[in-house]
């Protein structure tokens, strides 16, 4: 089996780019869809697919104004504390819109819907449809069912709730993804089987299920044909990917990366989110063998204390994490590293926190998603005694964020005079002679250039540091089109 099996015929060059921008309209005759997305990149991806789905099936176009929408969808996240109350608070505002327009359709999806489906019906009976992350592909059918029973007496109406966990069938029913720009996200697996003591994901998205290899490669090849040059592979535990091959075998995540790198047009590869347990030597080797792999890694660790990691049921030690990063930086010395940190986990002592702070300083993280611990109902950690005062947790969090911010500033400053590989994404909104792109490390890079170069990779020498995430540069070399 080779990757050519999955490449569509007639792949287009970047100059024949067929990028489609999202449609927004003020035409009152067109049916309009508003989606509020909360939480992670998986939810962002799912929301895009909902828009694709309802656009293809029922002709809905996106609007950024909920007041003019015919359908309001909320794609919810349950990671943080009070997530449920945030949902009901927003639904209260939507209720007023429905009182003004009884034909308005309201749907709630995502992880809070999985957890709180029955409760949503009780507390917000004006919600018409409730669906989970694994059943969003059934939205067109649910919408048809809703319209079919609008005139029925209340007691005859069927409750439109589908928060089941079917096999990973939703991708079989989703339309071809629309392309917006030169980057795209591709979901390769759903759920997580790690059962960390603090996490709700296994309960809201189910256990790990991988998409078949041929489906993933075909989707990416199709995106490349439409001009996409950077792919971000998505999953709750993306490096745990075990996709079935056409021949009936199993493809691992490192093997998938090698196959994706063969697809004409794909010049850059990212992925999120990964787990240290499955950050294997085979995966690290990909960074040496595949130039498409960016020198940026998001690898959640959650804490720098072995005691806390044990209580979290992360099943690895700090030394294991440090060893993996050392191997990676031996191959890529310029590797930028980001992570997740939970501060104030039950039982975290002053000594535990000091270990975490020193760990962060030693590894030089570039960015983090760091939060004070939130008790999530139904998780093992919710039963642990939590004696740390809230103000202490917040003080610790502020220290972590300050250390990481300083590290990020230093890493941005270190870019001065260096040559960065940049994907040129657009012409500046402020100046038609300025181009805007993204470096491997996610910094925005601006420089003087012609609009015809948009969609290409270029070598840019960094000449000025403007802000933490914005640098100026000078074009040195324009790479040949990768298609």
UniProtKB/Swiss-Prot annotation:
Belongs to the methylthiotransferase family. MiaB subfamily. Pfam families: Radical_SAM, TRAM, UPF0004. Residues 178-410 form the Radical SAM core domain. Keywords: 4Fe-4S, Cytoplasm, Iron, Iron-sulfur, Metal-binding, S-adenosyl-L-methionine, Transferase, tRNA processing. Its cofactor is [4Fe-4S] cluster. Its EC number is 2.8.4.3. GO terms for molecular function: 4 iron, 4 sulfur cluster binding; metal ion binding; N6-isopentenyladenosine methylthiotransferase activity. The keyword Iron-sulfur applies. Residues 31-148 form the MTTase N-terminal domain. NCBIfam families: miaB-methiolase (TIGR01574), MiaB/RimO family radical SAM methylthiotransferase (TIGR00089). [4Fe-4S] cluster 1 binds at residues 40, 77, 111. It is found in: Cytoplasm. InterPro entries: Elp3/MiaA/NifB-like_rSAM (IPR006638), Methylthiotransferase (IPR005839), Methylthiotransferase_CS (IPR020612), Methylthiotransferase_N (IPR013848), Methylthiotransferase_N_sf (IPR038135), MiaB_methiolase (IPR006463), rSAM (IPR007197), rSAM_horseshoe (IPR023404). The lineage of its organism: Bacteria, Pseudomonadati, Pseudomonadota, Gammaproteobacteria, Moraxellales. Its main location: cytoplasm. It is an enzyme of class 2 (transferase). This is tRNA-2-methylthio-N(6)-dimethylallyladenosine synthase. Residues 413-477 form the TRAM domain. PANTHER family: CDK5 REGULATORY SUBUNIT-ASSOCIATED PROTEIN 1, MITOCHONDRIAL TRNA METHYLTHIOTRANSFERASE CDK5RAP1. It comes from Acinetobacter baumannii (strain SDF). One of its GO terms (cellular component) is cytosol. Gene3D superfamilies: Methylthiotransferase, N-terminal domain (3.40.50.12160), tm_1862 like domain (3.80.30.20). It comes from the Bacteria. Monomer. Binds 2 [4Fe-4S] clusters. One cluster is coordinated with 3 cysteines and an exchangeable S-adenosyl-L-methionine. Catalyzes the methylthiolation of N6-(dimethylallyl)adenosine (i(6)A), leading to the formation of 2-methylthio-N6-(dimethylallyl)adenosine (ms(2)i(6)A) at position 37 in tRNAs that read codons beginning with uridine.
């Amino acid at each position: 089996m080779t990757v050519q099996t999955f490449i569509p015929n007639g792949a287009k060059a970047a100059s024949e780019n067929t990028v489609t921008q999202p449609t927004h309209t003020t035409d009152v005759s067109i049916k309009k869809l508003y989606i509020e997305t909360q939480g992670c990149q998986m939810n962002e991806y799912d929301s895009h697919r909902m828009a694709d789905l309802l656009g293809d099936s029922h002709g809905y176009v996106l609007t950024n104004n909920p007041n003019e929408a015919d359908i309001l969808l909320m794609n919810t996240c349950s990671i943080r504390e009070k997530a449920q109350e945030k949902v009901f608070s927003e639904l209260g505002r939507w209720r007023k819109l429905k009182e003004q327009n009884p034909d308005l359709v309201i749907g709630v999806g995502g992880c809070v819907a999985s957890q709180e489906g029955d409760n949503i019906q009780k507390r917000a009976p004006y919600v018409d449809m409730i669906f989970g992350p694994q059943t969003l592909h059934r939205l067109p059918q649910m919408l048809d069912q809703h319209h079919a029973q609008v005139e029925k007496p209340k007691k005859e109406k069927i409750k439109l709730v589908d928060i089941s966990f079917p096999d990973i069938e939703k991708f079989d029913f989703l339309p071809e993804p629309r392309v917006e720009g030169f980057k795209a996200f591709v979901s390769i697996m759903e759920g997580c089987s790690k059962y960390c003591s603090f996490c709700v994901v296994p309960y809201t998205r189910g256990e790990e299920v991988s998409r078949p290899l041929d489906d993933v490669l075909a989707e990416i090849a199709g995106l490349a044909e439409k001009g996409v040059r950077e792919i971000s592979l998505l999953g709750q535990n993306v490096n745990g990917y075990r996709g079935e091959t056409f021949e009936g075998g199993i493809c691992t995540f490192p093997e998938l990366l090698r196959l994706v790198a063969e697809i004409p047009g794909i010049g850059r590869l990212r992925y999120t989110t990964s787990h240290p347990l499955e950050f294997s030597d085979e995966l690290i080797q990909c960074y040496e063998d595949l130039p498409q792999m960016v020198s940026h890694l998001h690898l959640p660790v959650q804490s720098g204390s072995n005691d806390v990691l044990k209580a979290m049921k992360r099943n690895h030690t700090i030394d294991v994490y440090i060893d993996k990063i050392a191997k990676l930086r031996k191959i890529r010395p310029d590797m930028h590293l980001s992570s997740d940190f939970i501060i104030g986990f039950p039982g975290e002592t002053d000594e535990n926190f000091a270990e975490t702070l020193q760990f962060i300083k030693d590894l030089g993280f570039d960015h983090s998603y760091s939060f004070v611990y939130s008790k999530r109902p139904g998780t093992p950690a919710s039963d642990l005694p939590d004696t740390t005062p809230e103000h202490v947790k917040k003080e610790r969090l502020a220290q972590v964020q300050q250390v990481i911010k300083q590290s990020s500033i230093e890493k941005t400053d270190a870019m001065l005079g260096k040559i960065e590989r940049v994907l040129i994404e657009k012409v500046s909104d402020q100046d038609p002679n300025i181009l805007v792109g993204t470096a491997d490390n996610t910094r925005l890079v601006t420089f003087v250039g012609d609009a015809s170069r948009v969609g290409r990779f270029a070598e840019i020498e960094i000449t000025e540091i403007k802000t933490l995430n914005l640098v100026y540069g000078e074009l040195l070399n324009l790479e040949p089109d990768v298609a």
